[in-house]
Amino acid sequence: MLIAVRAAVSAVVLAVLSLLGVTILGASAAHAVDTTLVGSFTAPDGSGIPDVSITVSDEAGFSETGTSDANGDFAIPLPGGGTYAIEIDVTTLPDGIALENPEDASRSLLVLGGEKKIITKLVEGEGGGGDDGGFLDVSGDQFLQLLFDGILFGIMIALGALGLNLVFGTTGLTNFSHGDLLTLGAFTALILNEAGLHIIIAAPIAIVIAAVLFGWGQNKVLWRPLRRRKTGLIAMMIISIGLAIVIRYGVALFFGGAPRNFNQYAGQPGIEIGPVSTTPKALILAGLATIALIITVIWVQRSRIGKATRAVSDNPALASATGIDVEKVIAVVWTVAAGLAAFGGIYLGLTQDNIWNMGQRVLLIIFASVILGGLGTVYGAIIGALVVGVFIQLTSLVIPTEMKTVGALFVMIVILMIRPQGILGRRERVG
């Protein structure tokens, strides 16, 4: 019976995800402050090419032209996130140097916020040729940069995916408001930050507040009474969709629709680590997030309440019969999940921007990570997030940047056709 119910829930989830995907992928990225397009023009011999002209514009009327410096580098400030048209003036390239892919002279680029780096490959002669820049022609530096960016993005997604998977494993609830827990965590930190607390102090306080108020409190006020009334999983899932809408537009009502940044670390100069460029805050956040994920995994595997969580996830009725307080376990899981989500929201806000629909923008990716890794599995959520994060970045090598999320979701579909239970999920037999 339980398997049949979960199968029905899964079917509804896939249908809702399809509709949600159309909405998210069709929406334009929100505008942010301190958004910059950076890149470089490097000759085949490795030397920088100066005085190359590049123009960036959007449909709102923004247009800015920049030129590369003596090292071939350029940085063009943007008004915020969005889709931009990039035009490279090939007449400013030196004689004997051309774009390997002529289509790079005019292309569109989706920028979510922060610092966006583009890499343009140059060759000797007229360029182009019969093979104009497919995946096999990508430079090693470009591949490593995208791989690195994908890992960092995957770590951030894992914070949301792990909490979502813990809640699903213990309650069977497919929580469509989980992405908005990221938003609430980020805006809690933003309130404290704007009240005068440094973000280093505001962030951990916000995580604790979010864990207690939006995790434990939400379960106490909403989900526990619904479980006591034997509300069905599909009905609870629909309630979570309504809750997500209420949270999302509530944040928009009280904070406005414009993006907002924290008072510290909104813009940082990039650093070079070999062929990879990043920012100090991105490295620190990724390191702290990795530590948080490791601690959570150890807690689930080794602690008494963690073992009880696994028992409830396997069979709630049997766990209750052996003396485990199922409701206490669920309350703890909700608290941990909300804390991880709040951390993910602060991570997202520091690296991109804080805006009312920031959680919705990554919700589909979080669901994809959970489904790909395996529903109800701790390691699966993390591995799924890393796989999705890396594929989202790497697929931009072969498809337009604004469609890179589609490529990652296509890979997820292919993997699920081969292994329906996900990478680490367990196969269940019906009947």
Residue ranges and their predicted role:
Residues 277-354, 383:
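Helix-loop-helix "hairpin" substructures at the membrane interface of multi-pass membrane proteins
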Residues 198-243, 383-384, 388, 419-420:
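Alpha-helical transmembrane segments within multi-pass membrane transporters and channels
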Residues 143-190, 221-231, 235, 372-378:
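Single transmembrane alpha-helix segments in multi-pass membrane proteins
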Residues 61-73, 77:
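Short, acidic Ser/Thr/Gly-rich low-complexity loop/linker segments typical of extracellular
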Residues 82, 231, 325-328, 400-431:
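Cytosolic-side transmembrane-helix boundaries in multi-pass membrane proteins
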Residues 142-146, 300, 333-370, 395, ...:
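Inter-helical junctions in multi-pass inner-membrane proteins, predominant
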Residues 38-50:
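Structural motif
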Residues 234-302, 329-332, 406, 430-431:
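Transmembrane helix-bundle core of multi-pass membrane transporters
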